[in-house]
């Protein structure tokens, strides 16, 4: 016995057989031990060989267990194990079978052949089960084909298509593939390329998520249904799993050996197998190390000769980066471009998938939800592609609703929390003996009894509603299964069975589903319903909100009424600038009504006026109103961009420069938060070249950063502020009279192409004394909110407010001196008195005017 001539699996089997004998205290390693370990080997050829003959490996193992239990045991330190003479003969015969089959190494199948001819109990067991030499050789030919054992690890080359590929046609037969809607043109083009004589290898290229893999799955469904040209009828479409090919390839050359075995099997199938290679770019460089060939070079000869038909799929970027660089590989594939479907096509795709998702999640999906998914994803999720992002929206919204159905309703949860709270209170009061406590205890018990009754009723209702929804889900799952069976019987030509299902069981089940659905719809309109089982437009909008940060309510038509009140909201914080507020409100309303250009930002405004009149406050208020968050304001101080080279800080450094990987301050802010108000403060201080960046943003709503990525500005509001012309505004008696001077100053300072792209130029008036008086109220409200945190109230008299307005009024500096006046006259003095303990928690501070200062009293 020359162990060097044994394959890895065969030598492992010999060692494991010896270990098994030692473990069981047997003095000899016999054929039973060897057969036992051969049947238990992972990825070995023996279990599939036995199964091919029609014998279960598990039943053989049970019989071997009984045989091993009957063997005599030898214990003690001197006990050693030896190979029995009969097993030695098995090894000799195995070497003989390896020579007969012209194999270079003794493999596990040769050991099994020798065991089947053995003259002991093991041989008798195998022969009694039909595992004889003739049957084994026949099964071996089917599994091994014409492959010979020429390496120490031959198992990786046997049945390689089954090991390293997924059979898409089989999955389509079993209805495990989602229906493919549309894409007929691309599928026809793929079939056209596949039917060529040579270089019949299409490669699907397109953006991620447009449905490249779905096109191949659609082809698999067509092959199964016979809706293909004669040259493709009856073909098998197999998806190559490159990860499985690489995984576990420990030794040098093992990966290449596996891939060659796959190519060889495809070639031997004589055109019956079409290979689908998803993520085609992963072939380039796969398996290459220290001069060995990579996977793409192994495939090239077979692809060029037309012996191997392959369909590739990869994204545009990866095709350019990997495939185009290898011209020899590129010319062997014919490009089939897959464009992103339109919103209308996406809605059709979603309608086709609707039933699959309804069955999976056990909820109903309304048509309005599908339309909302396509429209909202296209409008708001700009960094991904249709239909993938729309399908994900529907899937997640349905998943969220399913979770709500399966978990306890909020109303019931609130009642249970209240009961728990009252029970704690009851235990606490039960320890007291006074009359008031006893009365409170009686009231508590009454309230607890009432709440317990309410909880029981709600629990019963919840279980009832849940049971109805689960019943509907069960019926839908049954219906899908029956439809799969009907398709299968029709394909097999068993028309009696197909007709029985089509005209009997399926209509009967559809009636049951319709009855349950009608009942659920009837109850859905009633008050007090605890569970919903329909995904609607609002659910989709909520998921979009989670993904993007845009407030859900702002996207729904029911909330559009709020935009009619936009002026009031802005005027509450931006005082004395009614014209500017009106212009901004009109621009926002135009956009929300869908009347503005969707390829430009929501609005772009140049605000000019003196300092402290509300230009920046307008931006903050807009961010708060539109996005419910003042932090949605991205502020960029243009005084930092006074040099020519500072443009790269906005959009990111070009390749080869320091900071290339970091991205730009503006582009990164918008990529991370696409829905924001962008404030460019004091733009007149920026270098002229910086304005070239603005042209693209204002006109097309997009900007390309230093890394070549397109950043979308279509959902941003751009506000630029400038102090240009302040001297005219401060001295003017009438704003109309200085309009021409201001326009001239703007033309002198900014290029015409920049001014021409701005939606509106807003001139902010200087603030008068009555405006400052209104701002006093706003500022004092902020002080009162801060005091509330210390449980202190604040009441300020009108005289005190007038006093603050008088000392805080300076037309040259706007509202900022007022803030300083409030800080000096009110906050500083009040802080001292609060710290001295004059105003304990829960008290109210009354502020009035003294002679030349404010006075504070306890209210």
UniProtKB/Swiss-Prot annotation:
Family annotation (SMART domains): AAA, ClpB_D2-small
Annotated stretches, region: NBD2: 559-766
Binding site for ATP 2: 609-616
Region (NBD1): 159-340
Source domain of life: Bacteria
Region (Repeat 1): 6-71
Similarity field: Belongs to the ClpA/ClpB family.
Protein's name in the database: Chaperone protein ClpB
Protein source organism: Treponema denticola (strain ATCC 35405 / DSM 14222 / CIP 103919 / JCM 8153 / KCTC 15104)
